[in-house]
Amino acid sequence: MTSRTRHCARLGIVLLGICCIASGIYLFRNWIDMFTRMRGQEMALSPNSRSFEGWKVSPLPLDFDIYLFNWTNPDDFYVGSNKKPHFEQLGPYRFREKPDKVDIEWHNHNASVSFHKKSWFYFDAAGSNGSLWDKVTTVNSVAHSAARRAAVDWFARTGVNIANKLYRQGVTITKTVDEMLFKGYEHPFISVGKLLRPQDVPYKRIGYHYPRNGSSEFDGDINMFTGADDIAKMGQIHTWNNLTHTGAFEGTCGQVHGSMGEFFPPNLGTKDTVYMYMPKMCRAIPLDYVETVTVHGVTAYKFSGTRHAVDNGTLYPDTRCYCVGGKCMPSGVINIGPCSFNASVYMSFPHFYMADPSYLEAIEGLRPEREKHEFFMALEPNAGVPMDVGGGFQANYYMEPIPGITLYENVPTVMIPMMWCEERVRVSEEIAADIALVPLIVLLGQIVTGILLAGGLICTCWYPTRQVTHFCHSDPKAKASVLRPLNAFGVNSSAATAPVAQLFRNNISSSGNERVGVRLLDYNRDSGIRLESGTMESSHRERLISEDSPDVVVR
């Protein structure tokens, strides 16, 4: 191989190293974004995408557990009884939910899809603790709501007092679990209300989940982004019932945003907050990162509802807009009256978990526990896919005395717990295995980036270093052959030999003024190489380099 060929090969190695370093730096800065774009093209929701069927009809079994609070001492509910309302929890009453998306319409102009959610609920007797025929006593919310509306007018108050006696209304009502939940029950005040003001009473019956079973209107019309133009927007709500602001709460509290629960933004971090939109609350619930967990071997970030999620300005100023009509309750409950025909209904975490202690102090029978009552979502951070979801919310009724209404003039002010629901879904091991590929691909990209950077550094730095090392350890004749031709190009050979002479000088001067024995190489044009040995005084050393000779003499 000629010297020119060797030179070109060496130059090629260095250039290859530079290219590897540049590629490694580019991947280091852009790999996550590149992978997100590639995955977005594959995962964006469309009629032909892989995610469509799983989104339309969930492939996972969905357990919907309902717990009811049975009021055991309603006869002692009056001012001066010195007895707190006592409740016992009944359930769970488990239902298997079969959800479906219907009335699907695609909107390519803004990469969104509109749909209605339709769910069927089937009672699971084997998984339940009780039957649908169990009796439960709870607050008569319809009668109290009618009394609240009539409180400002004397004629209305008189009419409500007469109706309460005529229809034998009490502070509480007792029904079967089936009637309380999906079947519903008839109430005389609802029948009268439909005759007087039908626009305010859209239903014939009342029940906690009536008429949710088999209804496509219960959650309203939902429009969400598909992620076709931006994968980070996939699954995020755009409008609810054609609204971007519900009007239920002022300012940002009434904005429509967040996820419906199927998709969340990718590339999540521990500082992020995710939002889940709750149609029946007319608001989004913030979930904050709490810990890193493992689900079927896949690392996931657990986001949970904190005190911030159920505050109304008591603890966090930014949540003050959840106060309705200037009335702010102690932290821990959410007023959903604007979403529930202005009923005095409040939502909280089960058993008033993370709520102000005053709610628990006013009643008996409830005991909040994080393991049982936490609302959480474990999300795979790279893809934003839910791995494990659990928890729910509790419905409460705010009971207060109403002057002029005989039935409610002497009742204490108490937040009455009625029921709470828990949805639990966890991905199967097969689905988890597919999801596990996402972090592996991300890791693979990082490994390739490291290999490119390391290989580039080796090619760029190792070869020149090897050449210098080889030169320093070569024999004197080889060094002379390298240095001598420099004169032909007008280069002062003394400058070229200076590093070698400096090396000799350093080796000698390291002994101070002591007499040292050294073996010196004297380069000579005629003889080629001459070895001189001697002993000399280091303080009298001097290097002489002839202008017409590359000989180095040390004396």
UniProtKB/Swiss-Prot annotation:
Any one annotated GO CC term:
plasma membrane
The name of this protein is Protein peste
Q: Which organism is it from?
A: Drosophila melanogaster
List residues in topological domain: Extracellular.
29-434
Q: Which family does it belong to?
A: Belongs to the CD36 family.
Q: Which GO terms describe its molecular function?
A: scavenger receptor activity
- Which residues are modified by glycosylation? N70, N110, N129, N213, N242, N312, N342
Bilayer-crossing regions: 8-28, 435-455
Q: How does it sit in the membrane?
A: Multi-pass membrane protein
Null mutant: what phenotype? (Microbial infection) RNAi-mediated knockdown blocks infection by M.fortuitum and uptake of M.smegmatis.
- What job does this protein perform? (Microbial infection) Plays a role in mycobacterial infection. Mediates infection by M.fortuitum and uptake of M.smegmatis.
What PANTHER family does the record tag this protein with? GH07959P-RELATED, SCAVENGER RECEPTOR CLASS B TYPE-1 SR-B1
